[in-house]
């Protein structure tokens, strides 16, 4: 049975978000096409996602010195435990669907923090004499991103930092097959917003058949 993580990073629901509407349409279609698969929703705005801070660095330092979990402070234990939960959940899944809005050329900060929970040496990648090697081979991802302007092509494609960063990090940890659905131009062309949304939903439903 394939396990799919539906990872969202939007404080709005599908009623108030073009990206979430497309994401939910994809998941609904995926479930219809693959009823035997397990889909787990991870709402990053309602999930404990520790940022890498002084506590985390201190905990890693203690581990490197040979100390155990019991040597950590309570704050360090809580953060490390939450990070490990996020990491283990991700590692034991087969497919990943990220749904994010673009905020100031990137995605919400919680997505970066989540990726920092995942890129862990010895777990999702390893160092070799030829450089780092990703360990999560054989998995695939989909990124659905909503943007008010057009960023998938043209002069602003170079500043689509969220899309490029997510693809880079996933590739670094071994997830080299990443699909992308752009839900874009709704603010630049408000008269076409509904048309843009419907086209993206149709695209998502079609992709769900082969994802």
Swiss-Prot record:
Annotated function:
Quinone reductase that provides resistance to thiol-specific stress caused by electrophilic quinones. Also exhibits azoreductase activity. Catalyzes the reductive cleavage of the azo bond in aromatic azo compounds to the corresponding amines.
Q: How is the cofactor bound?
A: Binds 1 FMN per subunit.
For whether the record's keyword set contains NAD, the answer is yes
Q: Which Gene3D superfamilies match?
A: 3.40.50.360
Q: How does it assemble?
A: Homodimer.
Q: What is its EC number?
A: 1.6.5.-, 1.7.1.17
Q: Which domain of life is it from?
A: Bacteria
So what family is this one in?
A: Belongs to the azoreductase type 1 family.
Q: Where are the transmembrane segments?
A: none
Q: Which organism is it from?
A: Bacillus thuringiensis subsp. konkukian (strain 97-27)
Give the top-level enzyme category. Answer: oxidoreductase
Has the keyword Flavoprotein been applied to this entry?
yes
PANTHER family the record matches: FMN-DEPENDENT NADH-AZOREDUCTASE 1 (PTHR43741), FMN-DEPENDENT NADH:QUINONE OXIDOREDUCTASE (PTHR43741:SF7)
Quote the record's binding site residues for FMN: 102-105
What name goes with this protein?
FMN-dependent NADH:quinone oxidoreductase 2
Which reactions appear under catalytic activity for this entry? 2 a quinone + NADH + H(+) = 2 a 1,4-benzosemiquinone + NAD(+); N,N-dimethyl-1,4-phenylenediamine + anthranilate + 2 NAD(+) = 2-(4-dimethylaminophenyl)diazenylbenzoate + 2 NADH + 2 H(+)
Matching entries from InterPro entries are given as: Flavodoxin_fold (IPR003680), Flavoprotein-like_sf (IPR029039), FMN-dep_NADH:Q_OxRdtase_AzoR1 (IPR050104), NADH:quinone_OxRdtase_FMN_depd (IPR023048)
What cofactor is needed?
A: FMN
**Which keywords label this protein?**
Flavoprotein, FMN, NAD, Oxidoreductase
Give the intrachain disulfide bonds: none
Entry GO MF terms? electron transfer activity; FMN binding; oxidoreductase activity, acting on NAD(P)H as acceptor; oxidoreductase activity, acting on NAD(P)H, quinone or similar compound as acceptor
């Amino acid at each position: 049975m394939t396990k799919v993580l539906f990872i969202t990073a939007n404080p709005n629901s599908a009623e108030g978000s073009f990206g979430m509407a497309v994401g939910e349409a994809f998941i609904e279609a995926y479930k219809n096409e693959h009823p035997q698969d397990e889909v787990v929703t991870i709402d990053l705005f309602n999930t404990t996602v520790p940022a890498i801070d002084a506590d985390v660095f201190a905990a890693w330092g203690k581990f490197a010195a040979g100390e155990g979990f019991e040597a950590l402070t309570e704050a360090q234990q809580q953060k490390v435990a939450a990070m490990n939960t996020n990491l283990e959940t991700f590692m034991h899944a087969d497919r990943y669907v990220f749904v994010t809005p673009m905020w100031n050329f990137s995605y919400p900060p919680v997505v970066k923090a989540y990726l920092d929970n995942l890129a862990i040496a010895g777990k999702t990648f390893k160092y070799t004499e030829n450089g780092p090697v990703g360990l999560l081979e054989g998995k695939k991802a989909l990124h659905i991103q909503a943007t008010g302007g057009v960023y998938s092509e043209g002069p602003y494609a170079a500043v689509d930092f969220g899309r490029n960063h997510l693809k880079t990090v996933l590739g670094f940890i071994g997830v080299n097959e990443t699909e992308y659905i752009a839900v874009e131009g709704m603010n630049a062309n408000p008269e076409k917003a509904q048309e843009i949304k419907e086209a993206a939903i149709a695209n998502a439903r079609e992709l769900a058949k082969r994802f």
